[in-house]
A protein has these predicted regions:
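Cys-nucleophile CN-hydrolase/nitrilase-fold catalytic domain and related Cys-dependent amidase chemistry
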Residues: 1-77, 81-85, 91-92, 155-163
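Active-site catalytic loop in hydrolytic enzyme cores
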Residues: 43, 62-143, 151-163
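Residue-level detection of beta-strand scaffold positions
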Residues: 48-50, 140, 145
């Protein structure tokens, strides 16, 4: 990508781990600022000379047993320059099905919108279900966002309604 002129790469939500159980997901929760996924992303950014919006990975939240679904941004020197914790968690019952999703049972919600300066422009960070909440995007644009990033991992039963 860098050879073709790219300066920014964006990875999907849950790019590093899409486990089938919450117990498995909890086993890969990383401390803020350190962990194998964060180290790998920092190294990739350095080696490739790219800024990376690293989709999401579970990152511990002090004072909460639930991790954040955190979107981390790494600059081309491998430094973490921004963190956005998904604000709008996906809680839904699927009509006509005996299944649903309760992301809030296993993830702590974020609190603040984040805009980060990158070589591509000012990027407003959001994740997946956030796209259902236009006020978040209005706020990001008011805060100077020129590009809106929406890493997502919708499932087949729910994705069609969102895209």
């Amino acid at each position: 990508a860098r050879a073709a002129g790219a300066c920014l790469a964006v990875l999907p939500e849950n790019f590093a781990f899409m486990g089938r159980s919450e117990a498995a997901r909890r086993s890969v929760v990383e401390a803020p600022g350190d962990g194998p996924v964060q180290r790998a992303m920092a190294e990739a950014a350095r080696e490739l000379g790219l800024w990376i919006v690293a989709g999401t990975t579970p990152v511990a939240v002090p004072g909460d047993a639930r991790p954040a679904n955190a979107c981390l941004v790494f600059d081309d020197r491998g430094r973490t320059v921004a963190r956005y914790d998904k604000i709008h968690l996906f809680d839904v019952d699927l009509p006509g099905r005996d299944e649903g999703y309760r992301e809030s049972a296993n993830a702590a919600p974020g609190r603040e919108p984040v805009v980060v300066d990158t070589p591509a422009g000012r990027v407003g960070l959001t994740v997946c279900y956030d796209l259902r909440f236009p006020e978040l995007y209005r706020r990001l644009v008011a805060d100077g966002a020129e590009i809106l990033s929406v890493p997502a991992a919708f499932t087949a039963p729910t994705g069609r309604a969102h895209w």
